[in-house]
A protein has these predicted regions:
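Bacterial N-terminal signal peptides
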Residues: 1-6
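N-terminal signal peptide c-region/cleavage motif recognized by signal peptidases
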Residues: 9-10
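Amphipathic, charged alpha-helical segments and their helix-to-coil junctions
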Residues: 13-255
Length: 255
């Protein structure tokens, strides 16, 4: 159940929030340590691809093919963690250090910033490009007026999960029926009509069952935010450092 953009933000946000920084994560990926790791991973994947192709030449049953594919996927994932795990940890320390030095309680992803905030990308890159490891701050993040929720956890609330599951089943059945109709369609106009009906059926189902729950979720987030005097609530995926976790408060309100 997707909730795009800030999940709660009053009109006075730009004037009230002064301790938010943001980082361009795409720029961080161009730091030499990350580009070197990407190059190493690409080389490792190329070797794995050759090994995988050689193994699969003599395998014909599907279960063995799936087992081998999973084996190689696990190898690639393990190498990725080995290469990038320490780099992500180092970047997190650098971000925390910059936030502390600039008295910022929250660092978010640049993608969600429309106006305001302090760009600390260059400061973080400078620390990551230095000869030594960034020094972690002595203090934990201060209390923040920015909250966050973990959408994945909210989606597991029983009535939300049930609605999502029902919608997925409905979508699958409608898609199957539409495919049958398209195969029997004689003209492009007939096929377009089938597609239009399929899209309309999904839109109606979404309006009836999903949209009301999205509204209830937004209302619950807004209520919790007001009680905790938060000026902004974002999804966990857009948060890089700091913030106030209100996920459990929201899930409790929705149960």
């Amino acid at each position: 159940m997707a909730l795009a953009g800030p999940l709660f933000a009053p009109a006075t946000l730009a004037a009230d929030v002064v301790d938010i920084g943001f980082v361009d994560q795409a720029a961080l990926s161009n730091v030499r340590s990350f580009t070197d790791a990407n190059r190493q991973l690409a080389g490792y994947k190329a070797d794995l691809d050759r090994q995988f192709a050689a193994r699969m030449r003599s395998v014909h049953d599907q279960s063995t093919q799936q087992r081998i594919a999973q084996e190689f996927q696990n190898k690639l994932a393990a190498r990725q963690r080995e290469l990038f795990g320490p780099l992500f940890a180092r970047a997190q320390v650098a971000i925390a250090s910059v936030a502390s030095s600039k008295n910022l309680s929250v660092i978010v992803d640049k993608r969600i910033v429309i106006v305001g905030g302090q760009d600390v990308t260059s400061n973080v890159i400078a620390l990551l490009s230095g000869p030594g490891d960034p020094i972690p701050p002595l203090n934990t993040p201060p209390p923040s007026s920015v909250g966050f929720v973990d959408q994945a956890q909210i989606d597991q609330v029983p009535k939300l999960k049930s609605a999502n599951d029902d919608f997925q089943k409905f979508q699958a059945s409608q898609q199957q029926a539409a495919q049958v109709k398209i195969k029997g369609a004689k003209t492009d106009a007939d096929r377009q009509a089938v597609l239009k009906d399929y899209q309309a059926a999904l839109a109606d189902k979404n309006k009836q069952e999903i949209a009301p729950l999205v509204d209830k979720t937004r209302d619950a987030i807004a209520d919790v935010a007001k009680k905790k005097r938060l000026l902004l609530v974002i999804d966990r995926s857009n948060l890089i450092y700091g913030g106030t976790d209100i996920t459990s408060d929201v899930t409790n309100a929705l149960k």
